[in-house]
Amino acid sequence: MNIQALLSEKVSQAMIAAGAPADCEPQVRQSAKVQFGDYQANGMMAVAKKLGMAPRQLAEQVLTHLDLSGIASKVEIAGPGFINIFLEPAFLAEQVQQALTSDRLGVSQPTRQTIVVDYSAPNVAKEMHVGHLRSTIIGDAAVRTLEFLGHHVIRANHVGDWGTQFGMLIAWLEKQQQENAGDMALADLEGFYRDAKKHYDEDEAFAERARNYVVKLQSGDTYFREMWRKLVDITMTQNQITYDRLNVTLTRDDVMGESLYNPMLPGIVADLKAKGLAVESEGATVVFLDEFKNKEGDPMGVIIQKKDGGYLYTTTDIACAKYRYETLHADRVLYYIDSRQHQHLMQAWTIVRKAGYVPDSVPLEHHMFGMMLGKDGKPFKTRTGGTVKLADLLDEALERARRLVAEKNPDMPADELEKLANAVGIGAVKYADLSKNRTTDYIFDWDNMLAFEGNTAPYMQYAYTRVLSVFRKADIDEQALASAPVIISEDREAQLAARLLQFEETLTVVAREGTPHVMCAYLYDVAGLFSGFYEHCPILSAENDAVRNSRLKLAQLTAKTLKLGLDTLGIETVERM
C-alpha cells in the first residue's frame, strides 16, 4: 500500500474542487517531525500564487472538500498553508494486518516496464579492482528493487572485451601456451596484462606481431576469435567468483560486451552521414554538436570514426543505446557509470536522439556516482600506492569480520562462524557504500563499517536478529498469531506502524532515482523506532494476551520489512549473531 499516493489522490481531488487547475501538484510528503503529523501537503503555495489568493485561504477551502474519514484522525493547517495529516490508529492497524497477509508486505505492482540496467563493466584480461565496486553493487541494488516491484529487468554487463590491446594479449597468450605446453589458468590476470604490455613496449617484433593480430581478429579470423574468446572466458570465470562472493545477481548470461555492437558500427556511421549529422573533418568522421561548446565557443566535434577507419567508445555507445531500444525493447535504460563519463554519455545520447534511434519517451539515465576515497581523502589505494584488487578487499573484509565475530562468540562452531563472518564482512563493505548518497565521494573506513552501532550492516543485521529473538522467547505459532487483531493505542506503536507502512514509498523512490541510500536510511529508522517501541511497550510481559499478540505482530512486520529491505540491497541476514 502506498499511503503517500492515496493521500496525494485525495488532496488533489479536494484542491480541484476548491478551484485549483486539474494538473495541480498536492506535494504530499512524509513529515519531517512528529508534531507535523505523518504526512504534509505543501502544494498550496504554488497553486495559491497562480489563483491570486493567500495559501492559507486556499488550504482552508481545500479542507472543506477533503474527505479522509477512516484514514486520518486529524487534519490541520500549519504555518502559511501547509496541511498536516495525522493517520488514524485504526487505519494503521488495518494496514499492518493487510501487509502481514502477503509475501510482498502489501507492496502494489506498478505498470510493468522493460528496464535495461548497465552496470559493473570490468575489462577483459584485467582483475576487478575497487573502482568496479560501486557500479556493481549500486547497480545490483537497483536491479533487485526494480525486479521486486515487478518490472522486467535486463542486466547488461558492458564488459571491455574489444580494442587494439587484444592483439597484444593474444600474442602474449600464444607465447605463454607455447612455453607452458597446453592451457594455462591465467591465475594472475593483472600480471598477465602487465607482462604483455612490457613485451609490447620493449620488443618491436612482438609489437609488430600484435598489430597484425588486431587486424586478423577484427577481420573475423577463426583462430584469433578463439584465442580472444578464451581470454574473455577466463576473465569472466574469475569475475563470476567475485560476483558470487559479493552476493550480486550478475551471471555469464548478462555479458553484453563492446564486441556485441561491432557489426552495427559501419551502418551507424553511414546513417549519420546520410542524415547530415556526421561530416568529414581532417580525414575523420565527426558530429558537431551545438549543445556542447569547445574552448573557442564553437560547436564541439565528436569523432565517431578515426582517420584510420577505427571506431571510438562514442560510436559503440550510440550503437548500444540503439540496440537496447530496438532489440531489447527497453522502456527505460539506466547506466551506473562514474561521474567522469557524464559528458561523454551526454554527447553520445544527444547524437542518438538527433538520429531518431531512441525516442524521447524512453529515458536514458546516467545514475552517476562519486569515488571511493581513503582516510586521507585521496583515491583508495594500497599502502604502496597501487590499485586495490577487489578480491583482496573482500579477503580482508572476511578476515576482519572473522576476528570480530570470534571475539563476540568464542564458542561458536567453525562452520557457523565462517558463515556469519561472510555475511557480516561482505555486508559491511556493501552497506558502507550503499548507505552513502551515490552522487558523492565517500571515505572507506574499516572501523566505521564494522561497528555494531550506527547506520552499518552489522547493526542492521543485529537489529534483525534481535526482533527474531522476541519470537523465539514468545514461543508462539505464527498461524495462531495470524488471526489475532492489531491494536494501536500507544504513540510508539503508531510511529513504528506508520514507518513500516512507508516501505512501498521507499522502494518507489529507490526505483525512480536509483538511490539505495534512501532504503538504508529507512531501514535504520525502522530499527531505531523498533528499539524505542521495544523499550517502552512491553511485548512478552504486556498487560494481556491481546496486547501481547498485537505487539508481536508489529515485531513480525518489522522483521519481515528489515529482511526484505536488506534483500533489495543484496545484504544477507542471519538468524543469530
Curated annotation (Swiss-Prot):
Claim: Aminoacyl-tRNA synthetase is one of the keywords in the record: yes
GO biological process: arginyl-tRNA aminoacylation
GO cellular component, as recorded: cytoplasm
Enzyme Commission number: 6.1.1.19
Xref: InterPro entries: aa-tRNA-synth_I_CS, Arg-tRNA-ligase, Arg-tRNA-synth_N, Arg-tRNA-synth_N_sf, ArgRS_core, DALR_anticod-bd, Rossmann-like_a/b/a_fold, tRNAsynth_Ia_anticodon-bd
HAMAP family: Arg_tRNA_synth (MF_00123)
Protein's name in the database: Arginine--tRNA ligase
Organism (species): Salmonella paratyphi A (strain AKU_12601)
Gene behind the chain: argS
